[in-house]
UniProtKB/Swiss-Prot annotation:
<comment type="pathway">
    <text>Amino-acid biosynthesis; L-serine biosynthesis; L-serine from 3-phospho-D-glycerate: step 2/3.</text>
</comment>
<feature type="modified residue" description="N6-(pyridoxal phosphate)lysine">
    <location>
        <position position="196"/>
    </location>
</feature>
<keyword id="KW-0808">Transferase</keyword>
<dbReference type="InterPro" id="IPR015424">
    <property type="entry name" value="PyrdxlP-dep_Trfase"/>
</dbReference>
<keyword id="KW-0963">Cytoplasm</keyword>
<dbReference type="GO" id="GO:0005737">
    <property type="term" value="C:cytoplasm"/>
</dbReference>
<comment type="pathway">
    <text>Cofactor biosynthesis; pyridoxine 5'-phosphate biosynthesis; pyridoxine 5'-phosphate from D-erythrose 4-phosphate: step 3/5.</text>
</comment>
<comment type="subunit">
    <text>Homodimer.</text>
</comment>
<feature type="binding site">
    <location>
        <position position="41"/>
    </location>
    <ligand>
        <name>L-glutamate</name>
    </ligand>
</feature>
<dbReference type="GO" id="GO:0030170">
    <property type="term" value="F:pyridoxal phosphate binding"/>
</dbReference>
<feature type="binding site">
    <location>
        <position position="172"/>
    </location>
    <ligand>
        <name>pyridoxal 5'-phosphate</name>
    </ligand>
</feature>
<dbReference type="InterPro" id="IPR020578">
    <property type="entry name" value="Aminotrans_V_PyrdxlP_BS"/>
</dbReference>
<dbReference type="InterPro" id="IPR000192">
    <property type="entry name" value="Aminotrans_V_dom"/>
</dbReference>
<dbReference type="InterPro" id="IPR015421">
    <property type="entry name" value="PyrdxlP-dep_Trfase_major"/>
</dbReference>
<keyword id="KW-0032">Aminotransferase</keyword>
<keyword id="KW-0718">Serine biosynthesis</keyword>
<keyword id="KW-0664">Pyridoxine biosynthesis</keyword>
Length: 360
């Protein structure tokens, strides 16, 4: 029996994609091979690779000025790879810290430069807001400005993306990429791990403006130097072939759903239903300011936290899984990525209401 999976990542996958991958597991398109057995330079995999790149460019509207790269290491590795590729001769990078992940990025950058805290969304209640551009205090000559546009742990999403002129904006989009349209031209670099909205863990997507490819530090490993990866069409070393294949299937699925405009409408409906339920209750609490609430990751707390384990056990009995909040913040968290259907959110909301009534 399939359950409703609210995991923050690796996360729920579209069932159509899972079924297609199962059907093609032993024999991809009459090749007699599984995708995971193919040479990454053979014509069969090359067709998969090129289709994935093309479909992602189409979905996001990536302009010709930007290159799409498939790497490995996830978002965590990019926290080191970004400064190694962008610092050049500069010694400072600016950070807007809106949650746990941008805080990690800030800390990792200390190994390569002197990071400057341009703004913070931290309050007495934790990370609960996305600072407006007017609050950002940029340094005199930063190599770039880093922003995590959706904080998976804290449930903070930044919707207003400013124009920073000549300063490249770097965004960690791991947990909301492909959930809504984006103006890619505003960014110098976008990066994200795949295991939330793109596909399975193993491949990392980097979208980088071409004029930024000449800034790498000499210490940057060649396998992670964007210029080298771009020059080799993401095939400098053996790529995560099966993860790229799965990502390609997800891109095709997104196109069949009507593209990102249609997906955004679904995500608004799902998140609104869940937040409205929380706000109408005196038993559940979300601490994030309404304007910064994530559509993908919804943390919430029970008024009586001694009942947390009962809540999780009851949810599991109804086929509602992986609702436990991150260990650093506690409580609950429902990650409602693209592949989580509206029916799953409705089932969760119904359970939340029942649980509250039983405890009243």
């Amino acid at each position: 029996m399939r359950v409703f999976n609210f995991s923050a990542g690796p996360a729920a996958m579209p069932e159509e994609v899972l079924r297609q991958a199962a059907d093609e597991m032993l024999d991809w398109h009459g090749s007699g091979m599984s995708v995971m057995e193919m040479s990454h330079r053979g014509k069969e995999f090359m067709s998969i690779h090129e289709a994935a790149l093309t479909d992602l460019r189409d979905l996001l509207g990536v302009p010709a000025s930007h290159r799409i790269l498939f790497l490995q290491g996830g978002g965590i590795a990019e926290n080191a790879i970004v400064p190694m590729n962008l610092l050049g001769a500069r010694k400072t990078a600016d950070f807007v810290v809106t949650g746990s992940w941008s805080q990690k990025s800030f800390g990792e950058a200390k190994k390569f430069c002197t990071p400057h805290l341009a703004a913070s969304g931290k309050t007495e209640a934790g990370f609960t807001r996305a600072p407006a551009r007017a609050e950002w205090q940029l340094s005199d000559d930063p190599a770039y400005v880093h922003l995590c546009t959706n904080e998976t742990i804290d449930g903070v999403e930044t919707f207003e993306i400013p124009d920073l002129g000549d300063v490249p904006l770097v965004a960690d989009v791991s947990s909301h990429i492909l959930s809504r349209p984006m103006d890619v031209a505003k960014y110098g670099v976008l990066f994200g791990g795949a295991q939330k909205n793109i596909g399975m863990a193993g491949v990392t997507v980097v979208i980088v403006r071409e004029d930024l490819l000449d800034r790498a530090l000499s210490i940057c490993p060649s396998a992670f130097e964007w210029k080298t990866v771009a020059a080799n069409n993401s095939l400098y070393n053996t790529p995560p072939t099966y993860a790229i294949y799965i990502a390609g299937l997800v891109f095709q699925w997104l196109k069949r759903q009507g593209g990102l405009e249609a997906i955004e409408a679904r995500n608004i409906e799902k998140s609104k239903l869940l937040y409205d339920t929380i706000d109408a209750s005196s038993f559940y609490l979300n601490k994030v300011e309404p304007a910064a609430r994530s559509r993908m990751n919804v943390p919430f707390f029970l008024a009586d936290e001694t009942r947390n384990e009962d809540f999780l056990a009851g949810a599991k009995a109804r086929g509602l899984l992986q609702l436990k909040g991150h260990k650093s913040v506690g409580g609950m968290r429902a990650s409602i990525y693209n592949a989580v259907p509206l029916e799953g959110v409705k089932a969760l909301v119904e359970y939340m209401k029942d649980f509250e009534q039983r405890g009243a």
